[in-house]
Amino acid sequence: SIGQKASIEALLGDQQCVEDMKKSFLKRRDLIVRLLNELPGVKCPAPNGAFYVFPDFSYYLNREANGKLLKDTFDISEYILDAVQVVTVPGDGFGSSGHIRFSYATSSKIIEEGMDRVKNALKII
C-alpha cells in the first residue's frame, strides 16, 4: 500500500530532516532550562526525551499573589495565566506537587518572551 511504501521511505530514507529537528529541539530545550533556572527559587533539570520541562516551583507555594494564597501548582499556573497570559500545566495533576510543566514545542523567540513574562509575574510574589 502507499502507506507502507511511505513508512519504508521514512525509515530508510535521508534522515537529515530528523537530525535538524532534533538539534532544534535540543537548542530550545537548553534555552528554556537556562531561563527557568535563572528565575529565583526555580529548579529545572533538563529532560531527556520530551518536548516539555517540569521545573520545581515549590519555592512559590504558600505565598501570596494579588491577594490570593498560592496553595498548590493549580493556583500558581492560574496566577501565571491570569497575570501574563502564559499557559502552564500544574504538576499536582500528575501527582508532582510543586512542579509545573512548560512546553518548548515552539520558537525560541516565543520561549524567550514567555519566560520574560513569567519572570515579571514572579516579581510580585
Spans of features found by a protein language model:
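PLP-dependent class I/II
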Residues: 1-125
